[in-house]
Regions:
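A conserved beta-strand-loop-helix scaffold within acyl/acetyltransferase catalytic domains
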Residues: 163-173, 178-203
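A short, internal acetyl-CoA/4′-phosphopantetheine-binding micro-motif in the GNAT/acyltransferase core
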Residues: 81-87, 202-209, 237
Length: 266
């Protein structure tokens, strides 16, 4: 997740339109009535401090590649890597071996970087939890399958919601909306730590934005998550305050932990 710090970014506008809101000409106008404060984290959500690690040690263990105490998703599934909260020198060497020079990973606030490792400037994320989200099924949302991956990949390439790899669909349920047989919007499940499921890849074709497809799909995916007794979770680029505020408008709340810093392997 790369933060945009240059005012009202294309990514902000794109995600706002995906969710079906029209926010005027300025970020302030779009978010005037929304609460962007970080909620007090009084719920038992510690597993979310390291969601990739938790997922790869539970529901997603079949996708894991390990070296010592460092674990990552298989490279055609997801870009996420799990690392201990307070990495040892050996952990950093294991990261280097797994990711290679130039690889990037998120680390928690407690991680002390070894000499020569630097934070990626302008990169960071926020985490939002959906304890108040019940979700709403959507009769128009269709279940996407591996046969749809080429079309899903093309939609992601056009809309840039974040990485979507050849086997990302295996991580969970993906729903889409079609017009004249063509996939024009989608959202689905990614990280799956115990008790939680992340909603990701929320995107809408440019020609169909502003119609609420993104909002409907987020709520439809959330409904499925709730049906199996789990709680929805989302991540967003720290600079994308437009999307963050609108996810809050749907009922998500910002956590005071769980936002990674990003590091590039030297």
């Amino acid at each position: 997740m790369v933060a945009d710090t240059a005012g009202w970014a294309d990514g902000d506008r794109r995600q706002i339109e995906d969710l079906g809101f029209r926010g005027g000409d300025s970020r302030g106008e779009a978010l005037r009535t929304l609460d962007l404060t970080i909620a007090d984290d009084g719920t038992p959500t510690r597993v979310l401090d390291a969601p990739a690690m938790a997922a790869l040690n539970s529901h997603h263990a079949r996708f894991a590649e390990r070296r010592g105490d460092v674990v990552r998703y298989q490279t055609d599934v997801s870009v996420w890597t799990g690392i201990p909260a307070q990495p040892t020198p050996q952990d950093w060497e294991d990261v280097r071996a797994l990711l290679g020079s130039g690889g990037m990973l998120g680390v928690g606030a407690a991680a002390v970087l070894p000499e020569g490792w630097e934070l990626v400037e302008g990169a960071g994320g926020v985490q939002l939890t959906g304890e108040a989200i019940e979700g709403v099924p959507d009769a128009e949302a269709v279940l996407l399958t591996p046969d749809d991956v080429p079309e899903m990949t093309a939609l992601v390439e056009r809309t840039k919601p974040g990485p979507f790899l050849p086997r990302t669909i295996e991580l969970g349920t993906y729903l889409g909306i079609r017009r004249d047989g063509r996939l024009v919007a989608m959202a689905g499940e990614r990280l799956h730590p115990p008790g939680w499921t992340e909603i990701s890849a929320v995107c809408t074709d440019e020609a169909y934005r502003g119609q609420g497809f993104g909002r409907r799909l987020v709520l439809a995916v959330a409904h499925g998550i709730r049906e199996r007794g789990e709680t929805p979770l989302m991540h967003a680029a720290a600079g994308n305050t437009g999307a963050i505020g609108l996810y809050q408008h749907l009922g998500f709340r910002l956590r005071d932990r769980g936002a990674p810093r990003f590091v590039r392997v030297p």
